[in-house]
Amino acid sequence: MEIRRDKYLDLLIHSCGNGLIKVITGMRRCGKSYLLFTLFKNYLIKQGVKEDHIIGVNLENRLNKSLRDPDALLQYIDSRLSSDGQYYVMLDEVQMVSEFEDVLNSFLSISNVDVFVTGSNAKFLSKDVITEFRGRGDEIHVRPLTFREVADFRDDYSQDMIREYMLYGGLPQVVLENDVNKKVSYLEQQMEHTYLRDIKERYEVRQDSDWSELVDIMASCVGGLTNPPKIADTFKSVKHSSISVDTIRLYLEYMEDAFVLERVTRYDIKGRKYIDSPFKYYFEDLGLRNARLGFRQVEPTHMMENMLYNELRAIGMKVDVGQVFTEVKIEDGSRQRKTLEIDFVCNRGYERVYIQSAYAMETEEKRDQELASLRKLRDGFRRIVIVNGLQPTYMNEEGVYIINLMDFLRAPEKYMEERL
């Protein structure tokens, strides 16, 4: 039984013949190669494309080390273009080729060649798609499996499945593995020996202790507001380290460029402006985050918030942290400015939805706390609170949708539409 990745497969299918280089980005081991070399290749063959017209090269494979030379790669592919008809060139981990931008641009002038490449590092790909391909690159960003993709594969939409997903995440190899000990071992090995080592080697990180401590700090503060100066203060007071703010900023960028972390900016909703700092950071895969901390600190409130962030990004939403400023009366009768937070301000085109993540709303005080910021909004956009447990989905008397977590995970797009 295969894991379906229909959204990404459809994007690849619709991109065929558009005259652009299709650049499939995403963290390592998230399923890019499977998408391109199995799902998409099988689709092409079913459409009648001959196998000798599909030229695939895995550049991570040591057997293809010689093809990491740009001239050798060009010569190899050119030798395979032996007849008329449409050819499909698929290059896996293309950033391993020196001057790969020039190689890819060389194919743009060949009308019967459609090029698809994968890469695992944003510095080498996402930013270069814009600068190097001069508007002729089409990026498709692949994320780890969503909850729905995992639940569909397992045929299991249960509370236990939610808990398992929040613990082990959505890397395909983890989902395919049934043995818990092997899941844990795989995640720990990948986090340490694939993601973090890859970053250290690529950017020549020398301060091993500070680097390791920073990764731990970021794993511990998921969903919390922070910034490089605050982290530097933590190093100084707790770790007795003098690591600079600039070094911390660089290290965070390295993790973002490897698609391990995503940074989320605060947005002043009433003032309609972005607030520079602090930020929130979320992990693209919760299993990697939990593995880094030895599967300790698995606090469900923050795990649910991180999971929802990933689900929203997977359906194409741009996500900010919302800020609403209000005044409250204090004991001496004076008024004091207070900042209220909205977990997710979700934008896609002209659509906007405000979302609060609430693991539980068991008391009136907790309910008021979750609704307080949403009550201050009067712009007509949808307001949602997503709640874990058996809470039924309904709209309250204030026009706020209270949505059960499982209902949302089954069909997130449905709840982001203009009308339910």
Residue ranges and their predicted role:
Residues E2, R148-F325, R337:
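Interdomain hinge/linker elements that couple catalytic modules in large macromolecular machines
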Residues E2, Y34, I45, V49, ...:
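A cross-kingdom feature that marks ATP-driven nucleic-acid transaction machinery
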Residues I3-G17:
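Pre-Walker A adenine-sensing motif
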Residues I24:
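Hydrophobic anchor at the beta1->P-loop junction of P-loop NTPases
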Residues G31:
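Conserved glycine(s) of the Walker
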Residues G56-G85:
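Short glycine-rich substrate-engagement loop in P-loop NTPases that contacts/grips substrate
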Residues D114-S120, H141:
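Structural recognition of the conserved hydrophobic beta-strand(s) that form the central parallel beta-sheet
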Residues K123-D138, R154-D155:
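Short regulatory helix/loop adjacent to the ATP-binding pocket of P-loop NTPases
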